[in-house]
Amino acid sequence: MAFLMKKKKFKFQTTFTLEELTAVPFVNGVLFCKVRLLDGGDFVSLSSREEVQENCVRWRKRFTFVCKMSANPATGLLDPCVFRVSVRKELKGGKAYSKLGFADLNLAEFAGSGSTVRCCLLEGYDTKNTRQDNSILKVTIGMFLLSGDPCFKTPPSTAKSISIPGQDSSLQLTCKGGGTSSGGSSTNSLTGSRPPKARPTILSSGLPEEPDQNLSSPEEVFHSGHSRNSSYASQQSKISGYSTEHSRSSSLSDLTHRRNTSTSSSASGGLGMTVEGPEGSEREHRPPEKPPRPPRPLHLSDRSFRRKKDSVESHPTWVDDTRIDADAIVEKIVQSQDFTDGSNTEDSNLRLFVSRDGSATLSGIQLATRVSSGVYEPVVIESH
């Protein structure tokens, strides 16, 4: 039984990419990283030395190595395998360095997961005297199984998800397609589509109550009794015991015309009734019907705007009582003016004449003979 307690051995081909370090608290400087395996191997390497630009350092350095891991034979859970990334800063022209911080990554969490991107905060070496900076290290880890049992378990991930403000997890789609469940209702609320039409409910009297929806035009209301779906009417007539088309046509007969209800009743499959006699007996045998509702507006905002406008027009306010009516003032001014033609014939046909010596005169028809003799010359003044 000793072989059952022996731990399982695994080998993984690991690809570690050192991407970048953001939020660096330095304006300038040269940074580099030292990476090494604390467990499962003796891999040690250094990255390139890069300058700080806009509080960010980008290495894009890729490391490839083999990592050994073990797992519990009873549970198959992989043991921790720590990989440390140490960030350092050059001093004295590269002759010395100072340790800024480090990040420990458990490679067992990434076993067999392909390529995974992870961002982690740097931890300070001396937590008492050195302030921990808020620099964020971004790495990419890819691990592929080389040898060992492919049936193993990875430890729970230590990564913490960051919730973005303004987004609710309940707004996610829970189902696909047009269903009538809660997922369908959430889909309708996201896409902005109309909810499904509600079916009419059955009253205690046995007649179906129509939902709060009407046709858009009076012509459709007039022809609705003629073009109603017989299958839908037959379903309602089987439940209530009364023809839906007959009830609709009888309610419209008072407003439009008298209709033969025996044809519609036989088409709907319900109780057929023939109406004969005067209108008085017809109203006695008919159940009380609600008058047809007015056409429903397209948008609720139009209804509220119309209701608000009607209420303002029907109820005069104090401002309307004290305000001067501009139309009345304009009408009063127009009535006080005299628009009759008071022009005299003597003032008409006036002309300006200028003689050769520079003298000018105004005259009417009397000076026309003198113009022809050449004493005066007419002057034409264009209107602008």
Curated annotation (Swiss-Prot):
Region entry Disordered, spans: 173-315
Species of provenance: Homo sapiens (Human)
Domain C2 NT-type per the UniProt entry, residue ranges: 2-145
PANTHER family: EARLY ESTROGEN-INDUCED GENE 1 PROTEIN, FAMILY WITH SEQUENCE SIMILARITY 102
Residue ranges, compositional bias (Basic and acidic residues): 280-292, 299-315
Keywords: Cytoplasm, Membrane, Nucleus
Subunit structure: Part of a complex composed of EEIG1, TNFRSF11A/RANK, PLCG2, GAB2, TEC and BTK; complex formation increases in the presence of TNFSF11/RANKL. Interacts with PRDM1/BLIMP1; following TNFSF11/RANKL stimulation in bone marrow-derived macrophages, the interaction promotes the binding of PRDM1/BLIMP1 to the gene promoter of IRF8.
Gene induction: By 17-beta-estradiol but also by a group of natural and synthetic estrogens as well as by estrogenic environmental compounds. Repressed by the antiestrogen 4-hydroxy-tamoxifen.
Polar residues bias (residue ranges): 227-254
Main location: nucleus
Region of interest: Required for interaction with TNFRSF11A/RANK: 129-138
Localization, UniProt: Nucleus; Cytoplasm; Membrane raft
Record field: compositional bias (Low complexity): 183-193
Protein name (record): Early estrogen-induced gene 1 protein
